Amino acid sequence: MKEKLMEHLDIKLEQVRRTMNTWEDSADMAIAFYNQALGAVELAGWLVYQDNPELEQEILKMWNDEYRIKFEKIIWGE
């Protein structure tokens, strides 16, 4: 499940990259993709919480330590 979520987040990262370089309202669109990715992480955490709280923590840590930072660097240019 974690690998499938990572694939989805990688796709969203690429959408954000392309959007930031293409569209006039790119920041708004990129933030929408960011929110979709965050929603996927929250849903994945909720789905695994009952059966595997450790995996939920792993998913949230992956988001906070890796993907959130990648998204923010693209969107805010840091």
Where are these regions (language model features)?
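Short, mixed-charge aromatic SLiMs
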Residues: 61-74
